[in-house]
Amino acid sequence: AVDPDEKMLQLNKFENKIIGDAEDLPFPDNSFNSVYCAFVWRNLNNPELGLQEVHRVLKPGGKFILLDMTRPKNNFLRMLHKIGTFKITLLIGLLTFNLKEYRFLHKSLDKYPQPEVHLSNDLFNTIDTIRMGLFGFVYLTVMEK
């Protein structure tokens, strides 16, 4: 597991934990058969640099599996989702005394484009993108180097 926050690494159950950044991965070229990233991509300062780094550390034919959230594609569902996540994140933030963190989650969904747009690049072949969850706002994309 790689995370820039040591506290987050302490929470996970992976055996190998490294403090690091997805935009500057601390691994040699062609190191991994697969890279898995969950609910992080929309928070990167430079997602394009992150894609370049994942490509660099993957072996030829390696898979990049990305799980994250975005707004639904449909305009009406996107509006409902935006209203719903605003209210839910506000409530959870108030109840847990973490309003700043939960407001950030709501706002991060607005700045993140649809995966089909954001992840289209010359580095990877996209194998599939599957939308899940209510309104399809959670997605899983599998790409190959």
Predicted ranges, named:
Residues 48-63:
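A short glycine-rich, Lys/Arg-flanked "PGG" loop and its adjoining helix->strand segment in the class I
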Residues 39-42:
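Short catalytic micro-motifs in class I SAM-dependent methyltransferases
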Residues 36, 65:
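A conserved beta-strand element that flanks and buttresses the S-adenosyl-L-methionine
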Residues 120-145:
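Core SAM-dependent methyltransferase catalytic element
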Residues 2, 67-121, 130:
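C-terminal alpha-helical "lid/dimerization" subdomain adjacent to the S-adenosyl-L-methionine
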Residues 1-25:
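Class I SAM-dependent methyltransferase SAM/SAH-binding core
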Residues 12-17, 60, 122-127:
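Short glycine/proline-enriched coil/turn segments at helix->beta-strand junctions
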Residues 23-35:
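A short acidic, Gly/Pro-enriched loop at the edge of an enzyme's catalytic core
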